[in-house]
Regions:
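A generic structural signal for short
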Residues: 55-56, 77-78, 109-110, 133
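N-terminal helical cap/lid subdomain that shapes the substrate entry/recognition surface
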Residues: 1-66, 73-74, 85-87, 99
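Residue-level detector of anion-binding/catalytic polar loops
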Residues: 7, 77, 154
Length: 191
């Protein structure tokens, strides 16, 4: 926006759009949809800007580091499935040492279909050497839960992610809902 002489918007306006990627961010910033004639050029500009800044000040949600340590101590494998393309996923996960312990990182373009299709989750299970019914998929978007259910996995809706006020994780049909990463440990202890 500022590159176009427009005032910047507060970061909290963009937060609920993060899960919708460039489409959501550009929609919030400019009121633009993919049908707009300038959308593709602006989307590529957004990608270039994102690529140069995506590792600056990037952190995981509070409690994720401790959760990963606990999973590893329990000898439980974990991975990441994102709709972000490998162009962004690979440098982002490489820049964060925590992700070196992930048994699988599957990007939105790792399979022919992105979430909510189950293919990326099934790919992650395959890379981990696990049957999908031995996996739990945690997500902060309705598409995550749809994909997890279609893959035959246990599903957990996370209320601490990028969802906005309009999202209602209790209505997504997940097997469980958690309010913090550490809540997952309590679920695992009950299993």
């Amino acid at each position: 926006r500022t590159d176009r002489g427009m005032p910047s918007l507060p970061a909290d306006r963009y937060r609920p759009m993060a899960g919708a990627g460039a489409r959501g961010m550009l929609g919030e910033a400019f009121g633009m949809t993919p049908e707009h004639p300038d959308y593709e050029a602006l989307r590529e500009e957004f990608f270039v800007n994102y690529e140069t800044r995506m590792t600056h000040l990037t952190t995981v949600f509070d409690g994720v580091g401790h959760l990963i340590v606990q999973l590893l101590q329990r000898q439980l494998m974990w991975g990441v499935v994102t709709n972000k393309s490998a162009r962004f996923t690979e440098p982002l996960t490489f820049a964060m040492p925590l992700f070196a312990t992930a048994g699988a990182v599957v990007s939105g373009d790792s399979t022919p279909h992105a979430k909510p299709h189950p293919a990326p989750l099934l790919e992650a299970a395959s890379r981990l050497g696990l049957n999908p019914d031995h996996c739990i998929y945690v997500g902060d978007d309705h598409r995550d839960i749809v994909a997890g259910l279609a893959a035959g996995m246990g599903t957990v809706a996370a209320t601490y992610g990028y969802l906005g006020d309009r999202a209602d994780p209790l209505q997504w049909g997940a097997h469980a809902v958690i309010n913090s990463p550490l809540d997952l440990l309590q679920l695992l202890e009950k299993a």
